[in-house]
């Protein structure tokens, strides 16, 4: 609650100078999007949330927003969906966190734990949020309070669960998408390289769960 209160108290910092205008992969169809049981299989701790965990979302709560993001960013194949959900579940600790808790980097968060500069770019890509950040060219030199306020704009569920798909499509681009569609193992390595991390054993556990959930482990 303190975090939310801080966000709302800082929103004037953001709006003061804005205007009033507010392959080989198996395909999936929009009628066969990931379901709650599949997402629980990938993120097993998402079965429930503690009342004192405001960031936390269960798989049941997350599923419609994840499905919406796949449709919005036109992610149609299971290889890419599996890689995306493996990353989301790992980074958010099974959807328990949407801002960086340790070491607590200001402005870092969403389901894929984007850094502050990407959260600003993501906010600018969303028509409802763009006017609120239109006057902010970059995160360089911004106070921690402002960085966290920008993060707060993109952490409501409808935006939080879309950030990973946005990053994959807009920041990693066609080469990584095609690599995932051709070969999940090789493509996942390319995806993690784009994110700026290694394919650790911990990340591989989530990928293997995703492969099993979507029948890609045979």
Q: Language-model segments: which ranges?
A:
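Fungal secretory targeting signals
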Residues: 1-24, 217-218
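Acidic helix/loop microenvironments that form the catalytic cleft of cell-wall polysaccharide enzymes
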Residues: 88-92, 176-200
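C-terminal helix/juxtamembrane-tail motif
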Residues: 202-218
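Generic alpha-helical secondary structure signal
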Residues: 57-60, 64, 186-189, 201-205
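Short amphipathic alpha-helical surface patches that serve as generic macromolecular interface elements
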Residues: 158-165, 185-188, 204
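Surface-exposed acidic, glycine-flexible loop patches that form ligand/cofactor-binding
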Residues: 72-78, 175-180
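Hydrophobic alpha-helical segments
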Residues: 167-174, 194, 198, 213
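Peptidoglycan-targeting cell-wall enzymes and recognition modules
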Residues: 24-65, 70, 79-173
